[in-house]
A protein has these predicted regions:
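Short, flexible, solvent-exposed loop/turn segments with mixed acidic/basic and small polar residues
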Residues: 91-101
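Long beta-strand-rich cores associated with HINT superfamily self-processing modules
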Residues: 97, 110-219
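General structural signal for secondary-structure boundaries
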Residues: 76, 92-93, 196
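Glycine-rich, low-complexity intrinsically disordered segments
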Residues: 67-70, 96, 109
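Surface-exposed, low-hydrophobicity interaction/linker segments
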Residues: 43-48, 52-89
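Generic alpha-helical secondary structure
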Residues: 36, 40, 44, 77, ...
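An acidic, glycine-/histidine-flanked metal-binding catalytic module
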Residues: 2-44, 51-57, 168-233
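Short amphipathic alpha-helical segments
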Residues: 102-106
Length: 233
């Protein structure tokens, strides 16, 4: 599909009959919003690259990849509006940038529990990364059983005329934690956010079982690593 320049888009809007013309102020806002979303997308790219580099390094050093998968997303406009409204904040770009830390999100899926803390520590130690906040929902799970390691970080993004610090939410979790969170989200969405108490309890028990499995897998992995170290001596 052939892409059109911004000038062509502007001209096409001007040529539309007056009754359906887009107000100039709205057009300017749309362009500003597009630019800000581009900046968040670039911030995601920077953070993903950092984790990919760490994964490559650790795959050589430890002979395995601690990161199974890296996912990312930029928050949808409607989600941004809903979150700002819920917090009683004005619906503006300035408000979004100031009040929302999770417009840009990166999710890192690790193999084992120890991998989560290893890669998060390595990211935190990088001198161009600023840690805004950390929430450890692994050691302190949410009431519904949700477990994950959350970081809000600020990363510099270099553009043609400036260096812009951008906030990115990073979620680090195991495969099992991601499996539970994904299914819980689907079920909650299907129930329109209202899950019966007995279902909520079942989900919480599933989360506890998954946690036990994660801990057992970590013990097995650590035991096998110890065996390898002793074999090399």
């Amino acid at each position: 599909m052939q892409m059109r320049s911004n000038d062509e888009v502007d001209r096409s809007i001007v040529q539309v009959p007056e009754i359906v013309q887009v107000p100039k102020g709205m057009l300017a806002f749309a362009k500003q919003f597009q630019e800000v979303m581009m900046m968040y997308t670039c911030a995601i790219r920077e953070v993903k690259t950092k984790f990919e580099v760490l994964n490559d390094e650790l795959s050589v050093r430890n002979k395995r990849n601690p990161i199974e998968m890296i996912k990312s997303r930029v928050k949808k406009p409607m989600s941004i509006v809903e979150k700002l409204s819920k917090r009683g904040q004005p619906i503006t770009l300035e408000s979004m940038i100031s009040n929302l830390d999770d417009v840009a999100g990166v999710r890192v899926i690790c193999s084992f529990l120890d991998d989560i803390y290893e890669v998060s520590d390595m990211i935190a130690k990088q001198d161009d990364i600023k840690i805004i906040s950390i929430k450890d929902y692994i050691k302190n799970p949410k009431e519904n059983g949700y477990r994950s390691y959350h970081m809000i970080i600020e990363v510099p993004v270099f553009f043609s005329d400036r260096k812009q610090p951008m906030k990115v939410e990073v979620q680090i979790r195991t495969i099992a934690m991601d499996f539970w969170a994904s299914l819980e989200h689907q079920l909650r969405y299907k129930a329109a956010g209202e899950i019966p108490q007995f279902i909520a309890q079942e989900l919480k028990e599933c989360a506890a079982n998954i946690t036990n499995s994660d801990m057992k897998m970590q013990k097995i992995h650590s035991f096998l690593e110890d065996m390898d170290r002793f074999a090399l001596k």
